[in-house]
Amino acid sequence: MRLNLDCMRDVLLVAEENLPLNGSLPMSDLLPLLPGYSKDEITYTCLKLNEANLLNIFKTPYPGGTFVNDILEITYNGHQFLENIRDPSLWEKIIQK
């Protein structure tokens, strides 16, 4: 599966806006906030953001895949990365390269 960079940015922005302090953002709440992406795209993106240490997630492996239950937090590195890609005009320049 291909990593959708716009989905990556949007997941981080939505997580930042909707994650409560000392709480989590369930996948069931995240999906409706990102209507432009499929469940598979969002799940894959969350797994890759976790792999890159930008998000901490709660996940459950099952035969044939992994289920993402919740986003637990944006890591410090995730916040730093998000600050670098937050500006829409800068983001457009980055993804055009």
Model-derived regions, located:
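Solvent-exposed edge beta-strands and adjacent loop segments
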Residues: 60-65
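Amphipathic alpha-helical interaction segments
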Residues: 22, 53-57, 85-89
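Generic structural signal for hydrophobic core residues of well-folded globular domains
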Residues: 15-18, 49, 82-85
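Non-catalytic, well-ordered alpha-helical scaffold segments
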Residues: 5-9, 40-43, 52, 72, ...
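Short amphipathic alpha-helical interaction segments
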Residues: 35-57, 68-69
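Glycine-/proline-rich flexible loop or hinge segments
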Residues: 29, 58-59
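Short amphipathic alpha-helical interface segments
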Residues: 2-34
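Short, amphipathic alpha-helical interaction segments positioned at domain boundaries
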Residues: 66-97
